[in-house]
Amino acid sequence: MPRIWKFGDSVNTDDILPGKFAPFMAGEDVFQTFAFHYVRPEFAAQVQPGDVLIGGRNWGLGSSREYAPQALKKLHIGGIVAPSFARIHYRNLLNLGIPAFEYDLTELLEDGDEVTLDAQTGLLTYADGTVQLPPPPEFLREALKEGSILEFFKKHGRFPGEEPGAEASTETASAAE
């Protein structure tokens, strides 16, 4: 069963994946094994698909390096819940199909607690009950069904939330490639 990994306030992108372990430095196939290398050295070896990260305020601040959320995607993180996110990092998470919920669970759940998170509805279930997180917007639920916004675009030829049958502009299509 998925479990909680709890972090504090102001977890930055270098905490998530230190720059010296970026894909071009460590290698495309292994860079995710350095996730939280200095903050939680055991993380990459012990994290399981579907595990949920609980953070404090301002999760993902710092540089806009996309390889930090890419490492979490490669580790199959089930979602991240924090009271607030750095906006660029939040958008990178959504672009990659990593559910991110703005909600404060820091007092409710502890490291290692077993949970299930329904990314489509935002329903988080734990031993003592459930919490209804703010559900993702419809466009994101569409993207999550395909794995990410890019995968949705590749399959449907449009972005989530756009009307089916509406052609993406040349500018929009070029940006997705």
Swiss-Prot record:
Catalyzes the isomerization between 2-isopropylmalate and 3-isopropylmalate, via the formation of 2-isopropylmaleate. One of its GO terms (molecular function) is 3-isopropylmalate dehydratase activity. This is 3-isopropylmalate dehydratase small subunit 1. The keyword Amino-acid biosynthesis applies. Coiled coil: none annotated. Residues 157-177 are annotated as: Disordered. Pathway: Amino-acid biosynthesis; L-leucine biosynthesis; L-leucine from 3-methyl-2-oxobutanoate: step 2/4. GO terms for biological process: L-leucine biosynthetic process. Its EC number is 4.2.1.33. Gene3D superfamilies: Aconitase, domain 4. It comes from Deinococcus radiodurans (strain ATCC 13939 / DSM 20539 / JCM 16871 / CCUG 27074 / LMG 4051 / NBRC 15346 / NCIMB 9279 / VKM B-1422 / R1). InterPro entries: Aconitase/3IPM_dehydase_swvl, AconitaseA/IPMdHydase_ssu_swvl, LeuD, LeuD_type2/HacB/DmdB. It catalyses: (2R,3S)-3-isopropylmalate = (2S)-2-isopropylmalate. Pfam families: Aconitase_C. Belongs to the LeuD family. LeuD type 2 subfamily. Residues 162-177 have a biased composition (Low complexity). Heterodimer of LeuC and LeuD. Keywords: Amino-acid biosynthesis, Branched-chain amino acid biosynthesis, Leucine biosynthesis, Lyase.
